[in-house]
């Protein structure tokens, strides 16, 4: 929970509901983009007994948590519900919700649900093994994270739910439905189902028909920032918002995060550093990667798409390193009243660029068509404790995250022709001053860090404001509200050093993948169906 103003505010405010993978938040902003207060709660996704890889989304409990967060945010802000002019919701992508024909939610899964591995393989075999390419050419998605394998799994193993289903939405749309009673999806989030056309920004029912699935469960498509409905009396009683408050279409977390960062024009590039790292490039028109390495998603800006690559578990790897090896540093940081990562960065800053040649093996570059990673490890360690220690390994991890990001951006530039002239760096990773400088050095372009680094909720609030006429347009408002903390200029000497390190790392990583292929080591993660 956070609160930035201890007096009783007055005026107009916007609320963003942000449903992440591990937590949910209700965040209140004023019209200048200042965060006033937030209520937050963690939530868990439930494995189903005897269903490997399953992660169901608990509709009943999670709605209660959302209501708790809304009431908490209003309380912390010392605001009456009448001060909230509009509300919008954003969420993790790929997670889906099914409703019966009366509009009641009956089943949902989180984005991390991986139960449909067999169904992914089954669908790949369609059309002489060409179905996945057809899906990608239309939607920019492969089958690994799409909705179709999950729907096919339900048809196989839960035909009762499959037969009852009348409508499908994303998790952000479920929140909007719980508030307003209305059902619709937006292109930015629904695009990750693999069933939405990148050009028309509407459903492609023929993809479901080709897969032998029902095409009568597709809800209306409304653009982000358009009015969906109003808070019902029932929802108002449950969550504390005022009945009649406008509910506006939100969207996918990454795309709304880009809106909150002002990344709204073709050619702009962002690296979003969280548990996963996303490298996102706005493309001037819909285009796909002929090698199927990169996913293409609809932006929340109408008519625009984004090339998106993903580095796996980057933030999680740093947390693992901190918790597994840095107990002393955690205690010292606590005594000094600083963040442990800040202390580790201070230590790592004294290590020369290149980290004495240590090569972390964690996430690979993105290969969307055949998506798997090598076993986690460190390569090229030294027995010299002056050169190989916690500070060296921490710096090596930061350098490696930047190298993987640079590789992913290079892949995007290769097929799209869009090469980054600067990078916006946001998310938790952007709090690291050393990490920001390393990213600039590795990519060779200036890196801009915003004041508001967790921008998804701000982007969602902008959508709410546009939907009720408080803001003129999504793109103009995103540009106007973003404020910059610092710009990092690349060190050209380090750039050459990191280019050589990148070449070496790519060769070593290829060999490490071979060990996974031989069954000698265990992949960090592999997509369903591989």
Swiss-Prot record:
Enzyme Commission no: 2.7.1.189
Any Gene Ontology CC annotation: cytoplasm
GO molecular function: autoinducer-2 kinase activity
Pfam families documented for this protein: FGGY_C (PF02782), FGGY_N (PF00370)
Disulfide bonds listed in the record: none
Keyword Transferase part of the UniProt annotation: yes
Record's subcellular location: Cytoplasm
GO biological processes: carbohydrate metabolic process; quorum sensing
Top-level division of the source organism's lineage: Bacteria
EC supergroup of this enzyme: transferase
Chief place of localization: cytoplasm
Xref: InterPro entries: AI-2_kinase, ATPase_NBD, Carb_kinase_FGGY, FGGY_C, FGGY_Carb_Kinase, FGGY_N
SUPFAM superfamilies (alphabetical): Actin-like ATPase domain
Reaction(s) this enzyme catalyzes, per UniProt: (S)-4,5-dihydroxypentane-2,3-dione + ATP = (2S)-2-hydroxy-3,4-dioxopentyl phosphate + ADP + H(+)
Keywords: Cytoplasm, Kinase, Transferase
CDD domains (alphabetical): ASKHA_NBD_FGGY_AI-2K
Functional summary from the UniProt entry: Catalyzes the phosphorylation of autoinducer-2 (AI-2) to phospho-AI-2, which subsequently inactivates the transcriptional regulator LsrR and leads to the transcription of the lsr operon. Phosphorylates the ring-open form of (S)-4,5-dihydroxypentane-2,3-dione (DPD), which is the precursor to all AI-2 signaling molecules, at the C5 position.
UniProt record similarity statement: Belongs to the FGGY kinase family.
Xref: PANTHER family: AUTOINDUCER-2 KINASE (PTHR43095:SF1), SUGAR KINASE (PTHR43095)
Name the record gives this protein: Autoinducer-2 kinase
